[in-house]
């Protein structure tokens, strides 16, 4: 039975998303586009016949594949601000398409699907806004991933293969059709990936191997920054237990003391290796043992962030399918089961309300150094996994 308070979900969700959109428009027009400027510069180089310089001539590090610069270079025919607006408009369209992709998985009354979807977006509002602000591509990666996983068409897997090479963050998802013995989908994803790798050759670049080598060097040069913006579990281990001063961004340029001097470099390295192995085993366990379902795919999409040494805040748009599944169940709880909302409300707070605008510079800096958004993401994974193994979400 649908609780009486459910009638408030739609108006409150619409109002919240409206506020989210207004905030996003203001942020992107006032102080946005930092990462998009790097993309735009690379696209300009391709259009001017200087594709070989995309990794050497950049306002910041360009870390994406050569095909990303080549395939999307037509966007640089437009002036920067128009191109940036078009880029973010495409993101909004992608999120609308995602609404229809996930609609078959609405558990309750279809009339409540719209507020469920809106509140799932609100759950990731902070990483969503950051992705829009900086002009990042994580929203596109999320939508392409869920399109392939939910529709299981060869076309969707072909496109996922293309974008997975552009930003290798989602490459592990290409293992899914192979383990599920869906040969056509697997071949399609490989074809897309190969096209994405080899596309510069199609354009006739003589220095194709050099470009790939420069791309690899650009990725390797990222290093392992322990600054507070890095929300990875591995960075958290070093910040907590190495005893080294760290850079908390909101505190200024000087490093500050944080954490405890408990473990040696070797011990911390071994802890990180153990964590990565544990995550890989967990990923493979779900991949091999669970049946094809939205629960399985939401978990796999969420887990890909866990072993990374670099996890920036907009990456947590990948929390969306987990939030969707959990809210699908919890928004309609009644009576004594309402206590289950508390950890999810706490997770929402960790994800969205720990910025300096809400709790001030000092406290927000400490929360950021504790990888608070990753902790929220881990809670969502734990909740979704335990729920999926005890009952259907």
Regions found by a protein language model. Name each.
Residues 292-296, 308-320, 329, 335-339:
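Short amphipathic alpha-helix initiation/capping segments at coil-to-helix junctions
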Residues 2-156, 180-313:
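Primarily membrane-embedded glycan-assembly and transfer machineries that use lipid-linked glycans
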Residues 160-177, 308-318:
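Transmembrane helices and adjacent periplasmic/lumenal helix-loop junctions
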Residues 324-393:
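Aromatic-enriched
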Residues 304, 319, 350:
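Residues in well-ordered beta-strands of folded domains
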Residues 10-11, 171, 340:
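Sec-dependent signal peptide recognition
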Residues 97-101, 143-153, 176-181, 321-335, ...:
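Transmembrane alpha-helices and membrane-interface helical segments
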Residues 89-97, 136-144, 163-170, 190, ...:
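Membrane-embedded alpha-helical segments of multi-pass membrane proteins
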């Amino acid at each position: 039975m649908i609780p009486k308070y459910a009638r408030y979900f739609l108006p409150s969700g619409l109002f919240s998303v409206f506020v989210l959109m207004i905030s996003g428009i203001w942020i992107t027009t006032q102080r946005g586009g930092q990462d998009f400027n790097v993309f735009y510069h690379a696209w300009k180089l391709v259009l001017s016949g200087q594709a070989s310089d995309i990794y050497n001539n950049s306002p910041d590090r360009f870390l994406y594949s050569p095909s990303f610069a080549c395939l999307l270079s037509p966007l640089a025919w437009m002036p920067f601000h128009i191109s940036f607006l078009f880029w973010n408009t495409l993101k909004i369209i992608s999120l609308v398409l995602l609404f229809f992709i996930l609609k078959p998985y609405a558990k309750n009354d279809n009339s409540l699907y719209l507020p469920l979807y809106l509140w799932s977006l609100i759950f990731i509002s902070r990483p969503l806004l950051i992705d829009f602000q900086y002009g990042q591509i994580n929203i596109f990666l999320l939508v392409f991933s869920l399109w392939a996983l939910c529709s299981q068409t060869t076309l969707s897997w072909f496109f996922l293969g293309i974008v997975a090479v552009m930003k290798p963050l989602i490459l592990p998802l290409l293992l899914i059709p192979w383990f599920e013995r869906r040969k056509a989908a697997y071949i399609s994803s490989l074809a897309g990936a190969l096209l994405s790798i080899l596309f510069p050759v199609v354009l006739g670049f003589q220095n194709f191997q050099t470009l790939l080598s420069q791309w690899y060097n650009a990725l390797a040069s990222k290093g392992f920054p322990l600054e507070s913006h890095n929300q990875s579990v591995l960075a958290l281990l070093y910040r907590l237990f190495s005893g080294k001063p760290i850079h908390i961004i909101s505190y200024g340029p000087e490093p500050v003391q944080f954490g405890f001097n408990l473990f040696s470099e070797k011990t911390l390295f071994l802890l990180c290796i153990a964590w990565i192995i544990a995550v890989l085993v967990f990923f493979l366990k779900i991949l091999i043992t669970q049946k094809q379902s939205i629960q399985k795919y939401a978990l796999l999409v969420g887990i890909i962030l866990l072993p990374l040494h670099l996890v920036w805040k907009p990456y947590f748009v990948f929390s969306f399918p987990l939030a969707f599944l959990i809210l699908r169940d919890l928004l309609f709880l009644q009576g004594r089961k309402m206590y289950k909302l508390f950890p999810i409300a706490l997770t929402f707070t960790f994800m969205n309300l720990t910025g300096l605008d809400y709790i001030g510079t000092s406290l927000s800096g400490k929360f950021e150094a504790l990888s608070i958004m990753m902790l929220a993401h881990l809670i969502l994974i734990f909740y979704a996994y335990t729920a999926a193994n005890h009952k259907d979400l």
